[in-house]
Amino acid sequence: MKILYSLRRFYHVETLFNGTFVLAGRDQETTGFAWWAGNARLINLSGKLLGAHVAHAGLIVFWAGAMNLFEVAHFVPEKPMYEQGLILLPHLATLGWGVGPGGEVLDTFPYFVSGVLHLISSAVLGFGGIYHALLGPETLEESFPFFGYVWKDRNKMTTILGIHLILLGLGAFLLVLKALYFGGVYDTWAPGGGDVRKITNLTLSPGVIFGYLLKSPFGGEGWIVSVDDLEDIIGGHVWLGSICVLGGIWHILTKPFAWARRAFVWSGEAYLSYSLGALSVFGFIACCFVWFNNTAYPSEFYGPTGPEASQAQAFTFLVRDQRLGANVGSAQGPTGLGKYLMRSPTGEVIFGGETMRFWDLRAPWLEPLRGPNGLDLSRLKKDIQPWQERRSAEYMTHAPLGSLNSVGGVATEINAVNYVSPRSWLATSHFVLGFFFFVGHLWHAGRARAAAAGFEKGIDRDLEPVLYMTPLN
C-alpha cells in the first residue's frame, strides 16, 4: 500500500480512502488526507489554504448581498419588519439607515445600496478565492515570506493574531464613527417612541463599562445583556476597539512568553479549535442578546421580547379595564394578589397576574409610567399616551413564540398574529450554531492535543470492508 504521509512533515492522522484518487494534484498520498477531509489537505499549502479562505469569505458576503436584495424586493413598508420574516433589514435599520421617528421606514434605497455593495465585494473575493485555489502559488513562504507561515512558528502565529485583533478593533470603531459622525444610529429610547440620533455623550467610565462584565447573568442583573442605553453601547465599542487595537499591536511586537509557549498546543488544528471555541461563545452571547435586549435589537424592527409581549398584554388590559371603571390600584385577582398591580418582593409596584415573573422588563413604552417605587398609580391614571397604548397592543399580539409551522402568538390569545418573530429565528439559530461550534471545538481540541502528545493514529481499519471493495474510479 502507498505511504500515507507527506514527506514535508509527518501528520499523525490516518484517513484511509481510495489512495489513487487525485484531486487537483492534492491527493491522499501527498497529504495524508482524503478528498472528503476538505481543507485538511491544504494544511501545509499556505497558498491554496488562502484561496479556500478567500473563497469562503466570498460565499459569506454573497449570501449577505443576495439575501439583502431578496429582503428589499419582498419588503412591504406598511407592515412592521418583524412581521415579514426579515433578519438583515432590521440590522440596517438599527444602524439608522432609511428610518425615521418610531422606526418608520422612509427610504429603502440605502438597503438596496448595501445589497449591491456586498454583491460586488463578493465577486472580488470570489475571483481572489478561485485565483489562489487554482492559479496562485501552492505555498507563499518562498515568494511572499510576509504572508507565509509555519504552524508551529509561535512568533509568526501571534503576529497573525495581532493583525486580526487590529482588524476587529477597527470594525468596532466603524460603529462608533457611524453613531458619532455619520448620521447616528436608531435609539429606541428617544422621547415619543424612538428615533435616529447622533450619540454625543459617550459613556467612557471604566467602572460603568466593565461593571457590566461583573454583574450576575441572572434576572434583574443580566450581565452585559442588560445594557439599555446607547451611550453605554457605543462607549463600550470605544473601549473594545481600543483594547483590540492595542492588544493587536502588542501581539505583533512581542513573542509569546514561556508560560504561553508551554500552555498552548501550537498546530493548525489547535488554532482551529481555539477559533471554534471563541465563535461558540459569540453564538451563545448573541442568542441571549437578541432574545432579551430591546436596545441593541429594537422591538420596532425585531418585534417585542418575550417578557415585553407579556407585560404589554397586562398593560393593554389595565388600560381597557381602567376606562371601563375598574380601580386598577385595588382590584383583586383570582389568587388574592392584585389583578392589575401588585408589589414585587423588594417593594416595587409591578404588573399583577402571570406577567409578574417579568417584572424587571424595561421598555421605552413603559418606563415613562414608572416612579421611584415602580409603576406610578397617578401616572397610570393620567399620563398614558396614545402611542404607548398602540405599541403595547401591537406587541401583545406579536409575542415571539412561533413554532416551526408558524402557530404564532400565545395559545390562549385569539388576536395573536400568525408569524415567527425574527427574535425566535435569530436566538434559536445562534444557540444551535453555538452548540455545534462548541462540539467542533471539543473535537478538534482533542485531536490537536492527541497529535501533540504523539498518540493520534486514527481508527484501526485493518478489517474495514471498504478496503476490499473496488475503487470508485
Curated annotation (Swiss-Prot):
Topology relative to the membrane: Multi-pass membrane protein
Key words, A-Z: Acetylation, Chlorophyll, Chloroplast, Chromophore, Manganese, Membrane, Metal-binding, Phosphoprotein, Photosynthesis, Photosystem II, Plastid, Thylakoid, Transmembrane, Transmembrane helix
Presence of the UniProt keyword Transit peptide in the record: no
GO molecular function, one term: metal ion binding
Free-text comment on the cofactor: Binds multiple chlorophylls and provides some of the ligands for the Ca-4Mn-5O cluster of the oxygen-evolving complex. It may also provide a ligand for a Cl- that is required for oxygen evolution. PSII binds additional chlorophylls, carotenoids and specific lipids.
One Gene Ontology cellular component: chloroplast thylakoid membrane
Primary localization class, coarse: plastid
Maturation-removed propeptide residues: 1-14
SUPFAM superfamilies tied to this protein: Photosystem II antenna protein-like
Phosphothreonine modifications at: 15
GO biological process terms, semicolon-separated: photosynthetic electron transport in photosystem II
One Pfam family in the UniProt entry: PSII
Annotated transmembrane regions: 69-93, 134-155, 178-200, 255-275, 291-312, 447-471
Residue positions, PTM N-acetylthreonine: 15
Localisation per UniProt entry: Plastid, Chloroplast thylakoid membrane
Annotated binding of [CaMn4O5] cluster, by residue: 367
Quaternary data: PSII is composed of 1 copy each of membrane proteins PsbA, PsbB, PsbC, PsbD, PsbE, PsbF, PsbH, PsbI, PsbJ, PsbK, PsbL, PsbM, PsbT, PsbX, PsbY, PsbZ, Psb30/Ycf12, at least 3 peripheral proteins of the oxygen-evolving complex and a large number of cofactors. It forms dimeric complexes.
UniProt function note: One of the components of the core complex of photosystem II (PSII). It binds chlorophyll and helps catalyze the primary light-induced photochemical processes of PSII. PSII is a light-driven water:plastoquinone oxidoreductase, using light energy to abstract electrons from H(2)O, generating O(2) and a proton gradient subsequently used for ATP formation.
Family named by the database record: Belongs to the PsbB/PsbC family. PsbC subfamily.
Record HAMAP family: PSII_PsbC_CP43
Protein's UniProt name: Photosystem II CP43 reaction center protein
Organism: Sorghum bicolor
